[in-house]
Amino acid sequence: MSTVTITDLARENVRNLTPYQSARRLGGNGDVWLNANEYPTAVEFQLTQQTLNRYPECQPKAVIENYAQYAGVKAEQVLVSRGADEGIELLIRAFCEPGKDAILYCPPTYGMYSVSAETIGVECRTVPTLKNWQLDLQGISDKLDGVKVVYVCSPNNPTGQLINPQDFRTLLELTRGKAIVVADEAYIEFCPQASLAGWLAEYPHLAILRTLSKAFALAGLRCGFTLANEEVINLLMKVIAPYPLSTPVADIAAQALSPQGIVAMRERVAQIIAEREYLMAALKEIPCVEQVFDSETNYILARFKASSAVFKSLWDQGIILRDQNKQPSLSGCLRITVGTREESQRVIDALRAEQV
């Protein structure tokens, strides 16, 4: 008699799935964490809501209204979720039939688009970006048949550059009546002029992902947003969990999105941008650094001589970066989160000491 294991009972696509390798999963014993694009220091909050015996609102009113005001959209155009990662998954669950429809994304880019689709059993199609990391619009057009959701990260993680807005418009015209286009704006606070939030009225099939994990310094809160037209939001509400945000999370998120919270966020952004420019200038003078790419974000992508050896050397010194070697077109590249001046100096000194 054959013995069926628990793993045998699992769905085939789950058995074959490679989970997303988050910065925390990759681990390390560092004291300079520059691998997850987090804000380097903690922001203090006091809980104002102490009553936890009742279930929270599905979409907490204060959070939704504060975010809508901040983003310049209507409250009906906002959905809050457990990080933008949940938003990625909700869009696939709402719009893609497993075994029939596909998503499309353009590597090198964020890894959760493919993981979310593969978990659900939805086909993934890729159209690598051009050499300048802009969209290959002809390649996308050729692969659009059967695609229901297109993900475009701008500014792009891990490359750090903005997608050309005219290319976004062309993509939105190509997909009109065919697919949802998702602009992942996780890092938009570092270049707010580039947001597509003002385009929602023009493009009913546009959705925008946002997060409190980066500029708002709340990665541990797990709070993200989807901005879209009301018809899209209503569909997402059908597939979201009944209580996605706990009461303490909603409490802190509402405070972070208050007028004072927004002012504090913008001060953090200014500080990070100044530190980014300092670190970029220093990296360009270091012998083991071959190229430093422009960035509109809170991280820097650079190409190194002997990047694997450099990565391990810094790892052994407790400086944890993100290795991007396995991403298409990123051989020799490491991604460095912009941290404090002290952390920048640790990186600079360690790289200057490298003999490669």
From Swiss-Prot:
Catalytic activity: L-histidinol phosphate + 2-oxoglutarate = 3-(imidazol-4-yl)-2-oxopropyl phosphate + L-glutamate
GO molecular function, one term: pyridoxal phosphate binding
GO biological process, one term: L-histidine biosynthetic process
N6-(pyridoxal phosphate)lysine: residues carrying this PTM: K214
E.C. code: 2.6.1.9
SUPFAM superfamilies: PLP-dependent transferases
CDD domains hit by this protein: AAT_like
Record flagged with keyword ATP-binding: no
Keyword Transferase: yes
Annotated pathway: Amino-acid biosynthesis; L-histidine biosynthesis; L-histidine from 5-phospho-alpha-D-ribose 1-diphosphate: step 7/9
Cofactor(s) it depends on: pyridoxal 5'-phosphate
Keywords assigned by UniProt, alphabetized: Amino-acid biosynthesis, Aminotransferase, Histidine biosynthesis, Pyridoxal phosphate, Transferase
InterPro entries in the cross-refs: Aminotrans_II_pyridoxalP_BS (IPR001917), Aminotransferase_I/II_large (IPR004839), HisP_aminotrans (IPR005861), PyrdxlP-dep_Trfase (IPR015424), PyrdxlP-dep_Trfase_major (IPR015421), PyrdxlP-dep_Trfase_small (IPR015422)
SUBUNIT field: Homodimer.
HAMAP family recorded: HisC_aminotrans_2
Database matches in PANTHER family: HISTIDINOL-PHOSPHATE AMINOTRANSFERASE, HISTIDINOL-PHOSPHATE AMINOTRANSFERASE-RELATED
Family: Belongs to the class-II pyridoxal-phosphate-dependent aminotransferase family. Histidinol-phosphate aminotransferase subfamily.
Name of protein: Histidinol-phosphate aminotransferase
Source organism of this protein record: Escherichia coli (strain SMS-3-5 / SECEC)
